[in-house]
Swiss-Prot record:
Function per UniProt: Required for the formation of a threonylcarbamoyl group on adenosine at position 37 (t(6)A37) in tRNAs that read codons beginning with adenine. Catalyzes the conversion of L-threonine, HCO(3)(-)/CO(2) and ATP to give threonylcarbamoyl-AMP (TC-AMP) as the acyladenylate intermediate, with the release of diphosphate.
Signal peptide: none
Catalytic activity: L-threonine + hydrogencarbonate + ATP = L-threonylcarbamoyladenylate + diphosphate + H2O
SUPFAM superfamilies assigned to the protein according to its UniProt record, in alphabetical order: YrdC/RibB (SSF55821)
Official protein name in the record: Threonylcarbamoyl-AMP synthase
Length: 188
């Protein structure tokens, strides 16, 4: 495991199917290429997370998320509300497109997506050219890591790269809302 400032090393690791850790708004996240099934299964094994739960996709822009979302199942008002809320630490559960891999959406016909305002996430997703998975960096039953050092202690031997940086200082995970009902599914 390497601690890197250079985002290109993280992008190279992602392209090779590795799992990385990176700072987000509130905690460090674990990420991989959402379209790489081997990488996703590796990430889920590290987290001890069942594939049925699905994972969040995090991106630099909605354009990066659009291939994973079925906009035809949303009204113009619903889509406008979602887009007006970003970038922010706010995750929306949206209808999944037919191209969204089952290992991303889990047992659902939806996908959880977020456009982050964190500068490292923005740069990383732009350099990678697509969204990353975003799930809290921690082992099952352990608190989420909020510093690079915590990531290295808890997960260092299981991930390829830790991207240097700090969280934005938010406490806890992002809020999650349903794009169709606008209901809050997880308080942020």
């Amino acid at each position: 495991m390497a601690l890197v400032e250079n985002l290109q090393q993280a992008v190279d690791a992602l392209r090779k199917g590795c799992v990385i850790a990176y700072p987000t708004e509130g905690v460090f996240g674990l990420g991989c290429d959402p379209d790489n099934q081997t990488a996703m299964l590796r990430l889920l094994a590290i987290k001890q997370r069942p594939v049925e739960k699905g994972v969040i996709l995090i991106a630099a822009s909605y354009a990066q998320l659009r291939p994973y979302v079925d906009e035809t199942q949303l009204t113009a008002e619903q889509l406008t509300q979602v887009l007006a809320s970003w970038p922010a630490p706010l995750t929306w559960v949206m209808p999944a497109s037919g191209d969204t891999p089952s290992w991303v959406r889990g047992q659902f016909d939806t996908v959880a997506v977020r456009v982050s305002d964190h500068p490292v996430v923005q740069k990383l997703c732009l350099a990678f050219g697509k969204p990353l998975t975003s799930t809290s960096a921690n082992l099952s039953g352990q608190p989420a890591c909020v510093t690079q050092q915590e990531v290295m202690v808890q997960l260092g031997n299981q991930i390829a790269v830790v991207v240097e940086g700090k969280t934005s200082g938010r406490h806890g995970p992002s809020e999650i809302r349903d794009a169709r009902s606008l209901q809050v599914l997880r308080q942020g």
